[in-house]
Amino acid sequence: AKNTDLIKEFNKGGDIQFGYGPHAPYTVSDATFEKIIDQAQANNTWIHTHLHETAFEVQQSMTDFGMRPVARLAKLGLFDVHSQAVHMTQINDEDIENLSGKKCHIIHCPESNLKLASGFSPIQKLYNAGLNINIGTDGAASNNDLDMVSETRTAALLAKAVAEDAEAFPAYQAMYSATRGGALAFGRDKMGSIQTGFEADMIAVNLDDLNTQPVFDP
């Protein structure tokens, strides 16, 4: 009820907006997820949950529910509403198929996943399946910092190793995921890009230092 009150108070087009954040499938019951899905639809907002973060989570779901977490949440209808799946390291082709064409956005937190040895998210495969990828940091306790520039660089480099393809997740795609992709994940259609009519949320980057060289845009 408190969450819904905040949504009704703040979700009026301002800079601060709220959604629902059920932690993860292994801490939230089907009944609670169903209530949250109904509330998100009624209040036209998003749902944010950690998903397929560890192998244990997937194994436990198979034991408790007889299906993988993505399949369970797909059955409940989570991905039919605006949703965000955080981490997504322990996934297979069936999981990707369950998400493809749905309203789910992927929040990739590579440095947190590395620190916790949780696994590697195949973000190029997810991107190829039509899913919106965006960059996150998780929390400082599992990351050491909340540096989005560092996180984006790590995402771009790690994706190449995971895909075994030097052309996977190139710099422009990584930058899009850190900006426009993130805006879309939170339903902010007028953010994340320099366009007429968009909100002018920008930073200036000094490219004169040696550590920014060479500057090359093919």
What are these regions (language model features)?
Residues 37-46, 78-81, 98-107, 128-133, ...:
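Glycine-enriched alpha-helix->loop->beta-strand junction motifs that scaffold or abut catalytic
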Residues 1-89:
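Metal-coordinating catalytic core of metallo-dependent amide/deamination hydrolases
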Residues 34, 38, 71, 96-97, ...:
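Alpha-helical segments flanking ligand/cofactor-binding loops in enzyme cores
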